[in-house]
């Protein structure tokens, strides 16, 4: 059996080698020639999986070790009888930690009490729900918006988009969709951007294209935190220059998230092939507790991982893709013992 795997998939050799012969290729370089004789294709976000890639191939299973779905033509895969699995939720903890870290740093630098701020979360899936739990632990009031969930689940504490955009801190956590009753493409645009005020802290850590960048770059906010961009890696320089923190789509790039993404695909592939799982694979991420001896939450979080280094790395945007591919080691908070209480939820 032949497997073609994005070489950025975490521990691909240790996790997938016993299935057969592995060819590892950079995600952007995976093409129809490289997958023609493959049985299994495992990707991250940089490979467009569609008829152009797979027509004429013998691929029977596609696994994506990331949460996004806009790089996958699911209708095509279904029409060809190709099994598809996506590691939904694998990076929810990492992204929520990114947002909380930025809020804590901003509160210190701009001298405000985050417990007196409202946090508007748009999209209450894996990431949004995780972030809401962390915010509650920290005493931050949340405004939650997710029309599809509200429609089907009748959740009691959700509010409309206008109300959510009125929050002191607004963050997007929706998938990127262009069709359906509630498309998220350019969800924040010229028709509703006026709800964002010059005192608003605005995040996009979801997908590029959810906020209309040509409008965003002209609006004054208190702070912009931008991790996801239209047309990556050719990002909007004017918008980058407005940002308090501009990072190269790495909010979800913890070691834990990468491992969980690979492991979830591994589990799905075992099920697909009827193979027994190797229980030792779970030990690839285990490590002893690490100690942090800092007196404030800000200093503790920055000692665990300082996201300012990620922003500095792409001051030259030519580094965008290489930095993502060679991202520094970053562990999630539950691996650490600290003097300050970490909002682990």
From Swiss-Prot:
Pathway named in the protein's UniProt entry: Cofactor biosynthesis; pyridoxine 5'-phosphate biosynthesis; pyridoxine 5'-phosphate from D-erythrose 4-phosphate: step 2/5
Residues where NAD(+) binds: 146, 174, 227, 252
Major location (coarse): cytoplasm
Presence of the UniProt keyword Aminoacyl-tRNA synthetase in the record: no
Gene Ontology biological-process entries: pyridoxine biosynthetic process
Keywords: Cytoplasm, NAD, Oxidoreductase, Pyridoxine biosynthesis
GO CC field: cytoplasm
A single GO molecular function term of this UniProt record: NAD binding
Family matches, as InterPro entries: D-iso_2-hydroxyacid_DH_PdxB, D-isomer_2_OHA_DH_cat_dom, D-isomer_DH_NAD-bd, Erythronate-4-P_DHase, NAD(P)-bd_dom_sf, PdxB_dimer_sf
Pfam families attached to this UniProt entry: 2-Hacid_dh, 2-Hacid_dh_C
Subcellular location per the Swiss-Prot or TrEMBL entry: Cytoplasm
Binding site for substrate: 45
Active site: 207, 232, 249 (proton donor)
Reactions it catalyzes: 4-phospho-D-erythronate + NAD(+) = (R)-3-hydroxy-2-oxo-4-phosphooxybutanoate + NADH + H(+)
Function text: Catalyzes the oxidation of erythronate-4-phosphate to 3-hydroxy-2-oxo-4-phosphonooxybutanoate.
Record HAMAP family: PdxB
Family classification: Belongs to the D-isomer specific 2-hydroxyacid dehydrogenase family. PdxB subfamily.
Full protein name: Erythronate-4-phosphate dehydrogenase
Organism: Vesicomyosocius okutanii subsp. Calyptogena okutanii (strain HA)
């Amino acid at each position: 059996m032949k497997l073609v795997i994005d070489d950025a998939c975490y521990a691909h050799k240790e996790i997938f080698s016993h299935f057969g012969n592995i060819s590892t290729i950079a995600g952007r370089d995976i093409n129809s020639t490289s997958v023609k004789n493959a049985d299994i294709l495992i990707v991250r976000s940089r490979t467009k999986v569609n008829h152009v890639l797979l027509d004429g191939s013998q691929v029977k299973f596609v696994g994506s070790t990331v949460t996004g779905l806009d790089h996958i033509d699911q209708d095509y895969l279904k029409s060809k009888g190709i099994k598809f699995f996506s590691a939904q939720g694998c990076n929810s903890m990492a992204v929520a930690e990114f947002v909380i870290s930025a809020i804590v740093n901003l509160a210190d630098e701009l001298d405000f009490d985050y417990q007196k701020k409202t946090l508007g979360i748009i999209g209450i899936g894996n990431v949004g729900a995780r972030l809401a739990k962390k915010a509650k632990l920290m005493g931050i009031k949340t405004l939650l918006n997710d029309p599809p969930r509200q429609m089907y689940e009748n959740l009691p504490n959700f509010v409309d988009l206008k109300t959510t955009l009125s929050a002191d801190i607004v963050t997007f956590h929706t998938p990127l969709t262009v069709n359906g009753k509630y498309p998220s493409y350019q969800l924040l645009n010229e028709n509703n951007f006026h709800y964002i005020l010059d005192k608003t802290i605005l995040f996009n850590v979801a997908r590029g294209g959810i906020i209309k960048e040509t409008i965003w770059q002209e609006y004054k906010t208190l702070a912009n935190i931008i991790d996801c961009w239209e047309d990556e890696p050719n990002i909007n320089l004017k918008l980058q220059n407005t940002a308090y923190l501009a990072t190269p789509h790495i909010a979800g790039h913890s070691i834990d998230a990468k491992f969980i993404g690979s492991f979830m695909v591994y589990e799905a592939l075992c099920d697909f092939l009827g193979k027994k799982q190797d229980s030792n694979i779970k030990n690839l991420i285990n490590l002893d507790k690490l100690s942090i001896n800092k007196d404030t939450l800000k200093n503790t979080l920055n000692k665990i991982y300082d996201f300012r280094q990620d922003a500095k790395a792409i001051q030259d945007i030519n580094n965008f893709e290489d930095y993502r591919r060679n991202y520094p080691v970053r562990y999630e908070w539950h691996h650490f013992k600290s003097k300050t209480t970490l909002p682990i939820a």
